[in-house]
Swiss-Prot record:
Species: Borreliella burgdorferi (strain ATCC 35210 / DSM 4680 / CIP 102532 / B31) (Borrelia burgdorferi)
UniProt keyword list: Bacterial flagellum, Cell membrane, Membrane, Transmembrane, Transmembrane helix
UniProt xrefs under InterPro entries: FliR (IPR006303), T3SS_IM_R (IPR002010)
Protein name in the entry: Flagellar biosynthetic protein FliR
Function per UniProt: Role in flagellar biosynthesis.
Subcellular location: Cell membrane; Bacterial flagellum basal body
Length: 269
């Protein structure tokens, strides 16, 4: 009797592990390529954290995977990995809004070639972009945004989006979803950087008028130093309002991410 109980418990553990594995693959791919957990320095943490989350979330899933056909199960794992990458792609769009703001701003004040090594992404990035990225991380970690990130990106997505519906995906709806995400990226980046860019544009317009009226003025030296000083001054003065607008953008981004997941679930179905 004890022997058969051990066999039944072993079979239960095997079936449970095969149920957890697809969820683990999706959560791991989502966290691995998200901007907060993408560094290779915490790769082992990603795996164990994904395993813990998958064990918690899998209890709410009432789906039996086809374990009698290993090819079908392998395709399910591949589909779960693709869904995790798609979710990480949308989260990276939110994060890249602030990098794009820094890119716009750096080009206008003459710091396009001033780069700094980012220890998290392990690549060079512009100084102003790095400042905006750190601002984003501080705002993200100082509020309930991180909790909402896990609830929307892991809990809601696993419960609402199933990999079995990938075969019924309409290409037109998915392309529309991608175009909406890119439009969201440029819209939010321009909204944040528009006041700064408009002042710098006005400054360059004044310089153009001066160059016509006084051709002997060395505008190359004047424009670089003045635009750099003016840009840093605007950044210093407008930093509190910039933090408020950035926080609002993060809130809208998480709401948009939830809307994207709902739209994506309808597209798949």
């Amino acid at each position: 009797m004890y022997y058969w109980d051990e066999i039944l418990n072993l079979n239960f553990l095997v079936l449970k592990s095969f149920t957890i594995l697809p969820v683990l693959v999706r959560i791991f791919m989502f966290l691995k390529f998200s901007p907060f957990f993408s560094t290779i320095k915490i790769g082992y943490f990603n795996f164990f954290f994904s395993l813990i989350l998958s064990v918690i979330v899998v209890e709410k899933i009432k789906i039996i995977y086809p374990l009698d056909n290993m090819l079908s199960f392998a395709l399910i794992l591949l589909g779960e990995a693709i869904l995790g990458l798609i979710q990480a792609f949308f989260v990276n769009i939110i994060f890249n809004v602030f990098h794009l703001v820094g890119f716009f701003f750096s080009n206008q004040i003459g710091l396009a070639y001033a780069n700094i090594f980012d220890v998290f992404s392990e690549e060079d990035s512009m100084i102003i972009s790095q400042i905006f990225a750190y601002l984003f991380l501080l705002l993200f970690l100082s509020s309930d945004f991180l909790l909402r990130f896990f609830v929307i990106g892991i809990h809601d997505s696993v419960l609402n989006i199933r990999v079995e519906h990938l075969v019924n995906m309409r290409n037109s709806g998915f392309v529309k979803l991608l175009l909406m995400s890119f439009g969201f990226l440029f819209e939010k980046a321009l909204l944040i950087s528009f006041p700064i860019l408009s002042l710098l544009l006005l400054f360059y317009l004044v310089l153009g008028i001066l160059s016509k009226s006084s051709p002997q003025i060395n505008l190359l030296i004047i424009s670089f130093s003045t635009s750099l000083f003016l840009g840093l001054l605007i950044l210093y003065i407008g930093f509190p309002s910039l933090a408020i607008s950035s926080k609002r953008v993060i809130e809208l981004s998480l709401d948009s991410l939830a809307s994207f997941l709902k739209l994506f679930s309808r597209v798949l179905k």
